[in-house]
Each structure stands twice: as C-alpha cells, then as structure tokens.
UniProtKB/Swiss-Prot annotation:
Family classification: Belongs to the thioredoxin family.
Gene3D superfamilies: Glutaredoxin
BP GO annotations: cell redox homeostasis; protein folding
Site (Contributes to redox potential value): 33-34
Protein name (database record): Thioredoxin-1
PANTHER family: THIOREDOXIN-LIKE PROTEIN 1 (PTHR46115)
Ranges in coiled-coil conformation: none
Protein's job: Participates in various redox reactions through the reversible oxidation of its active center dithiol to a disulfide and catalyzes dithiol-disulfide exchange reactions.
Keywords from the named record: Disulfide bond, Electron transport, Redox-active center, Transport
C-alpha cells in the first residue's frame, strides 16, 4: 500500500492543492505527540478515500502562510472542496477524521 499523503513544502504548493476538488489538510508539528500518533491513521485513510487529496503541513515550516498562521492547536484538520473550506476540527481522533471524510465525499 503506497502513501498518498503529499508533504507540502511551500506556500505556493499549498495554495495550488487547496483548489483541488476534495482536500483534507493535516496541520501538525514534529514536536507534537498526538500528531505523530495520528499520522499513520492519516496515511491509511489516504488509501481508503482516494477521491481526496491528502496534504500534510508542518506548521513550523510554513508558518508564514495566512491559513497556517491562524492554527492555534495541533493536530488540526481542514477540509476543502474546490478551494472553499467546508469543515475543520482539532485533535487526534480517528473516528472524527473518518466521519468527516465520509460526510464530505
């Protein structure tokens, strides 16, 4: 099983992908224990929900982006459809992540 998660390395790359049809963004940090715990789940779900673009953003590396600069806790997940944010939540909950993906299929 391959990893479909795109590790975003620039503000331009994030902006480009946010315009995709269905996007889920994992905003996290390397120092965050819950972020490390949910990461394999996020990768697994990327193979189940193949109609979504799965993005990983390290908030410490992209902190100049307007969206990233507003993140107050990690992990935080944002869900986008055609460039518009449709949902978000914070916390390392597999059940909420899965149900939010299901609701936005």
């Amino acid at each position: 099983m391959s990893n479909r998660v795109i590790h975003v390395s620039s503000c331009e790359e994030l902006d480009k992908h946010l315009r995709d049809e269905r996007v889920v963004v994992d905003f996290s940090a390397v120092w965050c224990g819950p972020c490390r715990a949910i990461s394999p789940v996020f990768e697994k779900l990327s193979n189940e929900f193949i109609t979504f673009t799965f993005l990983h953003v390290d908030i410490d590396k992209l902190n100049v982006h307007p969206i990233v600069s507003k993140i107050k806790s990690v992990p935080t997940f944002h869900f986008y459809r055609n460039g518009s944010k449709v949902s978000e939540f914070s916390g390392a909950s597999e059940s909420i992540l899965r149900s939010t993906l299901e609701a936005n299929k």
